[in-house]
Amino acid sequence: MNLNKHPRHPLTFGPTPIQPLKRLSAHLGGKVELYAKREDCNSGLAFGGNKTRKLEYLVPEVLAGGYDTLVSIGGIQSNQTRQVAAVAAHLGLKCVLVQENWVNYADAVYDRVGNIELSRILGADVRLDAAGFDIGIRPSWEQAMEDVRRAGGKPFPIPAGCSEHPLGGLGFVGFAEEVRQQEAEFGFRFDYIVVCSVTGSTQAGMVVGFAADGRADRVIGIDASAKPEQTREQILRIARDTAKLVELGRDITEDDVVLDTRYGGPEYGLPNEGTLEAIRLCARQEGMLTDPVYEGKSMHGMIDRVRGGEFPEGSRVLYAHLGGVPALNAYSFLFRNG
């Protein structure tokens, strides 16, 4: 496998820390050792997160091509758009963000706090759009790029989650290589890796990266899209394309993609009672915050799997914390009593 042939522009502090979740592990019976790799602490750029790791492989193309405006898209509380806005500010570029109405959640301040508030502070041109949630290329995003061209700018397209960009999976191939280096220091290997999946490129990169040592199917995706067939198709397609880019040396198959579809409901961006319980439990056992859209759902999935005995006794499970905590502010009503 050859990831190093692809240029990378550092936006992160370096390897993200792995911490044992000792109290949570004990609370759940002590038969499975839980750890977290803190992608939520990976950068000083507006709280960072998993998209910042991905953007490291897109920025060289931005700089080499003379682009002056980053154009991205997400929901109103998108972590992706906040991270794109931060990277644009860091590089001295303009930024246009399309924020679609992906979540059926009514709150008076939903479009004024959290991620979207930070994007505005960072100087992005934030454009609200009424379109609902879907996965793939969006007309509103294409229109935003055309608007930049008409104004004389040169837009660089960054799709939702970086996932439709050809290089969108590379960052999390690097995640897997980083984990292997940390495992060598620890003196053990993780048996499973748990990660939230929606647009697909985070899990796809992990699948490719861990395929290099035979653990592709030990990457357990927890769907948070509530459109799991679309998400599964994206993961598989992106993983296959990424495997070619890094010269993995073998094909990625359907069996390599494991996606647990039990925790994404009731729909994208809306937590269920299990999500909220997982957020509170993780916070109160470990002081580690997760959000109602993504990490709360993947945390719910991991906790439920431990409780149900789905991880063999003695397993070491690595939870990939992808970030997203700023979105908690947009759901304050749900936590008004803690």
From Swiss-Prot:
Residues annotated with N6-(pyridoxal phosphate)lysine modification: K51
Superkingdom of the organism of origin: Bacteria
Assigned keywords, A-Z: Hydrolase, Plasmid, Pyridoxal phosphate
Pfam families: PALP (PF00291)
Molecular function (Gene Ontology), one example: D-cysteine desulfhydrase activity
Keyword Protein transport among record annotations: no
Entry keyword Disulfide bond: no
Catalytic activity field: 1-aminocyclopropane-1-carboxylate + H2O = 2-oxobutanoate + NH4(+)
Cofactor names: pyridoxal 5'-phosphate
EC number: 3.5.99.7
Coiled coil: none
GO biological-process terms attached to the record: 1-aminocyclopropane-1-carboxylate metabolic process; amine catabolic process
Active site, renumbered: S78
Primary role: Catalyzes a cyclopropane ring-opening reaction, the irreversible conversion of 1-aminocyclopropane-1-carboxylate (ACC) to ammonia and alpha-ketobutyrate. Allows growth on ACC as a nitrogen source.
Cross-referenced PANTHER family: 1-AMINOCYCLOPROPANE-1-CARBOXYLATE DEAMINASE-RELATED
HAMAP family reported for this sequence: ACC_deaminase (MF_00807)
Family to which the UniProt record says this protein belongs: Belongs to the ACC deaminase/D-cysteine desulfhydrase family.
Subunit structure: Homotrimer.
The protein's name in its UniProt record: 1-aminocyclopropane-1-carboxylate deaminase
The encoding gene: acdS
